[in-house]
Amino acid sequence: MGSGQWHMEKRSTLKNDSFVKEYNPVTETGSLSIIVLGASGDLAKKKTFPALFNLFHQGFLNPDEVHIFGYARSKITDEELRDKIRGYLVDEKNASKKTEALSKFLKLIKYVSGPYDSEEGFKRLDKAILEHEISKKTAEGSSRRLFYLALPPSVYPPVSKMIKAWCTNKSDLGGWTRIVVEKPFGKDLESAEQLSSQIGALFEEPQIYRIDHYLGKELVQNMLVLRFANRLFLPLWNRDNIANVQIVFREDFGTEGRGGYFDEYGIIRDIIQNHLLQVLCLVAMEKPISLKPEHIRDEKVKVLQSVIPIKDEEVVLGQYEGYRDDPTVPNDSNTPTFATTILRINNERWEGVPFILKAGKAMSSKKADIRIQFKDVPGDIFKCQNQGRNEFVIRLQPSEAMYMKLTVKQPGLEMQTVQSELDLSYKQRYQDVSIPEAYERLILDTIRGDQQHFVRRDELKAAWEIFTPLLHRIDKGEVKSVPYKQGSRGPAEADQLLKKAGYMQTHGYIWIPPTL
């Protein structure tokens, strides 16, 4: 262990049973039909089906109740779909342990082919679902239908119409119909509101689950617990003690294979306006009156509505060199592959504290983290401020971890200071615990009817209100992207903006993950 780490013994994890009883939704019985629309696409193969398999393998999907349907335009058989997804469900290391479960899971999958705007296709889908419900003796319980739209947003309206017209729950004994829609939810405020109105005319808000997989990440979900269950942070979490907040997303690869798609959206629409802004809400929100989903989402909306308009001088856009070499990208593209923007929240807790949102592709590393940087110690008698400030870092990926950067005495005979850390690395503390993937958690929440980690319509609207004016200026070429080298930290102008915002970088400090 490093000199500044906590000593963490392996011990049983204590659970608060009263919390579990109060906030876990009641388990329902009856048939459960999970319909994956866009079943032959990359999202379904790489994320949706693997998440469903892991839930099945862990016992969260009862084979006596559940059946999974794939729907897409591809004319393939049940077995061909199973073959397409088989390789994504288990890795070589765990294949032998999961052979039996994999076989049982694949047998639950049935495929229906048809267009996304065709009555006949959805009538066939409904017939297949009804046959499943009858075989599962739905008369003994409710009929539940979950539609996962692993599709481009352009087909959400026609698909939603077909589901509403032909495929909703028909049981007299209760149950539900729910739809899950993926980002992007529009390209700006107007298109997002239009999409919301089209879907909202067909389904009630409690039926609509707008998924942002960042809200399913373990340490993102930990944010409310960290803030409101630990007395340590309560008096510190404000403008009197915090100098700035940085929320960072980096990828070490470019847009290979999807340059044309990415060029329509850019890094702000792809990452910052949704993923990073959702994290900001959890960092900045006030304590909700309870853990009910609506109370939490009410507080998130208040944060978004308190963000003042973004200033162009507090934005740096970048585009990595070689991006336009992709034949699907226009030669004169101004689409940013990197952006740093400062958001400011006009309320009593956060006035004057810059929230720095930063995301980029083709950078020097792949990671995502939250950095809460505290102010300097007043009257510093050790003269050590140039070594760096206290900083609470939450590493979202890879290798989930939390650590607090502290100044301590360096071991030895002299009174010298050095930066170290108090460290909680999840892989060390929870060696025997399987940390679920974000999609597993969110799909399970959907089945349970828990909307806490999904985006509400007014929340979506408020998020687009923040970024739409800036995005329109970028689209018109009024804010330019500057070039940066692949494998770098991004444009130098971004570091200058951070310095101007008051972020103090700790030069020479490197966090070393503990050895297991």
UniProtKB/Swiss-Prot annotation:
State what protein this is by name: Glucose-6-phosphate 1-dehydrogenase 5, cytoplasmic
List the pathway annotation. Carbohydrate degradation; pentose phosphate pathway; D-ribulose 5-phosphate from D-glucose 6-phosphate (oxidative stage): step 1/3
EC number(s)? 1.1.1.49
UniProt keyword list = Carbohydrate metabolism, Cytoplasm, Glucose metabolism, NADP, Oxidoreductase
The UniProt record gives the binding positions of NADP(+) 2 as: 358, 367, 371, 395, 403-405, 423-425, 489, 511
For this chain, the family text in UniProt reads:
Belongs to the glucose-6-phosphate dehydrogenase family.
Naming one, the record's GO cellular component terms include: cytosol
What this protein is reported to do is described as: Catalyzes the rate-limiting step of the oxidative pentose-phosphate pathway, which represents a route for the dissimilation of carbohydrates besides glycolysis. The main function of this enzyme is to provide reducing power (NADPH) and pentose phosphates for fatty acid and nucleic acid synthesis which are involved in membrane synthesis and cell division.
Q: What PANTHER family has UniProt attached to this entry?
A: GLUCOSE-6-PHOSPHATE 1-DEHYDROGENASE 5, CYTOPLASMIC, GLUCOSE-6-PHOSPHATE 1-DEHYDROGENASE G6PD
Also noted in the record is: There are 6 glucose-6-phosphate 1-dehydrogenase genes in A.thaliana.
**SUPFAM superfamilies to which the protein is assigned, alphabetical:** Glyceraldehyde-3-phosphate dehydrogenase-like, C-terminal domain (SSF55347), NAD(P)-binding Rossmann-fold domains (SSF51735)
Organism this protein belongs to: Arabidopsis thaliana
Q: What is the name of the gene encoding this protein?
A: G6PD5
Q: Which GO terms describe its biological process?
A: glucose metabolic process; pentose-phosphate shunt, oxidative branch
Please list the tissues where expression of this protein has been recorded: Expressed in leaves and stems.
